[in-house]
């Protein structure tokens, strides 16, 4: 196993925990069930935060489950070896996560009533968060510098491919009734209201005190202190420095890292790539 990428259908994956044959099975053979709830994101867009919220919604705010079972078991990654196997044996209703672009997602989803919550985030913050996260992980190709990672991200030669392609692939689904589009920014700005929106989408109701418990137990500080959610359980086989894996949980951190030239270049790239999508889709713009 090397610090490189596994390539499948032109998309990069880690070399540990993923296999081309499993990725093919996920797309062609995995059966999505109508009761499934799926968290769909491009990496570093708030996946674990949303998973924590959904787990707490399931337990009505009670923290016992999230404090006793690792987050990757509560919401497994369907495309990973472990996740694919576990989910195939899990009874309904299932909660799981995926970073897959639309062309690699299980085909069975498109004829199912399963519910997808797609969480997107300002790609500038995604870029910064990804740089600090991935450089601490083993079994992936690492950039020599921040500048090199910036270039890779703009070109789409990073894990799970281009952010722009990921968004473009999934956005046509946003009008479907089993697809909820959210942004990290709105979740951050008004977490309570966004949780209510998720409840409405999933057909769930929460008492005010249950909502307050969810807000308390899914806060960044609570997650950082919860060893089942903060990655501290990850084996040293996977990680270089665990301290960096849950960093800030804020919006706008990119301003502390982009040079003026990088900010200008990225603005130009964003305008070019996203010109065909309505501006109001992106609350950070």
Curated annotation (Swiss-Prot):
Keywords: Bile acid catabolism, Cytoplasm, Lipid degradation, Lipid metabolism, Phosphoprotein, Steroid metabolism, Transferase. It catalyses: an alcohol + 3'-phosphoadenylyl sulfate = an alkyl sulfate + adenosine 3',5'-bisphosphate + H(+); (24S)-hydroxycholesterol + 3'-phosphoadenylyl sulfate = (24S)-hydroxycholesterol 24-sulfate + adenosine 3',5'-bisphosphate + H(+); (24S)-hydroxycholesterol + 3'-phosphoadenylyl sulfate = (24S)-hydroxycholesterol 3-sulfate + adenosine 3',5'-bisphosphate + H(+); (24S)-hydroxycholesterol 24-sulfate + 3'-phosphoadenylyl sulfate = (24S)-hydroxycholesterol 3,24-disulfate + adenosine 3',5'-bisphosphate + H(+). One of its GO terms (molecular function) is steroid sulfotransferase activity. Its main location: cytoplasm. Transmembrane segments: none annotated. 3'-phosphoadenylyl sulfate binds at residues 44-49, 121, 129, 184, 218, 223, 247-249. Pfam families: Sulfotransfer_1. Liver, adrenal and at lower level in the kidney. Is present in human fetus in higher level in the adrenal than the liver and the kidney. One of its GO terms (biological process) is steroid metabolic process. Changing residue 246 to P: Decreases of the sulfotransferase activity toward DHEA; decreases of the sulfotransferase activity toward pregnenolone. Gene3D superfamilies: P-loop containing nucleotide triphosphate hydrolases (3.40.50.300). The active site is at residue 99. It is found in: Cytoplasm. Subject to substrate inhibition. Alternate orientations for binding of steroid substrates to SULT2A1 may play a role in substrate inhibition. The modification Phosphoserine is found at residue 251. The N-terminus is blocked. One of its GO terms (cellular component) is cytosol. Its EC number is 2.8.2.2, 2.8.2.14. Changing residue 262 to E: Decreases of the sulfotransferase activity toward DHEA; no effect on the sulfotransferase activity toward pregnenolone. SUPFAM superfamilies: P-loop containing nucleoside triphosphate hydrolases. Sulfotransferase that utilizes 3'-phospho-5'-adenylyl sulfate (PAPS) as sulfonate donor to catalyze the sulfonation of steroids and bile acids in the liver and adrenal glands. Mediates the sulfation of a wide range of steroids and sterols, including pregnenolone, androsterone, DHEA, bile acids, cholesterol and as well many xenobiotics that contain alcohol and phenol functional groups. Sulfonation increases the water solubility of most compounds, and therefore their renal excretion, but it can also result in bioactivation to form active metabolites. Homodimer. Belongs to the sulfotransferase 1 family. This is Sulfotransferase 2A1.
